[in-house]
């Protein structure tokens, strides 16, 4: 019985935190960090402001928690570029992972994009260390394939930027895309269609499509 009672508060805490972070995502996307307020986050979550501040002492802590959640999801969904895959399979996997992430978790992409646009003040350590290291490591893999004549000579870093920007566009600018397409939301087969289109386009540019 004791273990059952111990689990209940933890479950309630987890549910409350998820509600707060979900509400905070919407608020930060709509208002940005400066315009967002703890009161608005609490109202959107259907909770008293005091309850929000019980779990997070201030707006900055909430924002950092949202960013941490965002980066964890982004890191898990980014896919990887492995030497043993070869350039064609690596690009196919990378594009698919990024498109799936953008369509499944558009808010995650928007939060990250807004933080970067606003100067990345809360992410400076990450962009200068982890992301820089990741890009340089993957660029070396592409360069190795280029040197071994496994793909056309392209700028590896800009190739990564191209894949990032083209895939994340469907999340960051979903309102614009859906308006042009005269739709309320994406359809199930959009992920497959966009993945195939971008993969084919990028592979051709890298000399990997006959």
Task: Say what each PLM segment does.
Residues 19, 23, 27-61, 65:
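Helix-turn-helix
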Residues 66-93, 138-144:
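Amphipathic alpha-helical linker/stalk segments
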Residues 1-4, 100, 104, 132, ...:
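C-terminal peripheral helix-coil segments that are non-catalytic and often amphipathic
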Residues 1-15, 22, 210:
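N-terminal intrinsically disordered/low-complexity leader segments
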Residues 111-115, 129, 162, 166:
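Short acidic/histidine-centered micro-motifs embedded in hydrophobic/aromatic stretches
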Residues 16, 59, 66, 70, ...:
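Hydrophobic/aromatic residues within well-ordered alpha-helical segments
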Residues 79-108, 148, 156-163, 192:
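Hydrophobic alpha-helical connector segments
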Residues 103-125, 174-182:
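Amphipathic alpha-helical segments used for helix-helix packing
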